[in-house]
């Protein structure tokens, strides 16, 4: 079961492939999660670029600056591309750190999983009980469900960038839920994953 309508996610995926041919970027957000998990697809496209690539993006799209959210935005019909830049955007972890921490995955440069998890937890703590927050929460579950290799890295990131409150928020929300069928977790499977996540993250 998808979180967004298939027509929207298909358009978004096709636009992401076109974008990948035009500029260099590091993929974050829902589509990065999808490439790791093959779980829920995304509607919006979230990328990190340097200022040189931002100039190239402006040649291909109409780009606007969102001063309030510290990002740039490009749009193609109903598909939005959110663009984050070093020394400007504020997303919990410095973008200049993130832009140098990617792997190659299915033809894309994708943020490393441990950083993606931490980034998702940070964003979830802001969006909370909204539809986008719900999607963030499900994405985090999917990432843990596919096994996290570098748990030490996650704990280090949490401490280095003072994300303790955001992790507590996530764990409290995790404790409230009893299932997440959108990502294939019935009550028994959810309880087991919750126990695993708590074992990895609590008091570390």
Located regions from the model:
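Compositionally biased terminal segments of proteins
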Residues: 1-204
């Amino acid at each position: 079961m998808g979180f967004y309508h298939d027509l929207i996610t298909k358009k978004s995926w096709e636009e992401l492939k076109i974008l990948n041919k035009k500029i260099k970027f590091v993929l974050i957000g829902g589509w990065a999660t999808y490439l790791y998990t093959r779980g829920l697809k995304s509607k919006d496209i979230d990328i990190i670029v340097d200022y040189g690539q931002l100039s190239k993006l402006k040649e291909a799209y109409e780009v606007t600056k969102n001063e309030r959210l510290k990002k740039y935005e490009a749009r193609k019909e109903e598909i939005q591309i959110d663009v984050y830049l070093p020394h400007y955007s504020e997303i919990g972890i410095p973008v200049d750190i993130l832009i140098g921490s990617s792997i190659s995955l299915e033809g894309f440069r994708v943020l490393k999983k441990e950083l993606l998890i931490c980034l998702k937890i940070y964003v979830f703590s802001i969006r909370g009980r909204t539809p986008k927050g719900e999607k963030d929460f499900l994405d985090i579950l999917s990432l843990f469900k596919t096994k996290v290799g570098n748990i030490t890295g996650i704990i280090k990131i949490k401490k280095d960038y003072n994300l303790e409150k955001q992790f507590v928020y996530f764990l409290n929300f995790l404790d409230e839920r009893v299932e997440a069928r959108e990502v294939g977790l019935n009550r028994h499977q959810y309880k087991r994953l919750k126990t695993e996540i708590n074992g990895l993250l609590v008091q570390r």
